[in-house]
Amino acid sequence: MEEERILCEAIHYNDGNIHRNQPKEIESGFIIAGYRHDTCVYIKSLINSNLREVKQGFLTNKKRFVDGYEAFEIAQKAGQILDPELAKEKGKRLLSEDLW
């Protein structure tokens, strides 16, 4: 079985509606994915929508949306973190600059 890896940054925008083709754990709202979180924010600025909640996180190759803490564990296990010692000093929360 393939090891789970981080694919890209993502933000969960919860507008209270159910949308098709979202990651497994997203019950309502939608995901915008991008190379960096600010790319996701910019794309969202082009869309008009009422939001209840906004969460930054990451998408994995297993079609899951995970927060920065779970992403840190996944990326660490997969050897994706550029500077593991620096990442540990900042805390066990993955940031986009830890990957790219």
Feature roles, as predicted:
Residues 1-56, 60-100:
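Linear-motif-rich, low-complexity cytosolic tails and juxtamembrane regions
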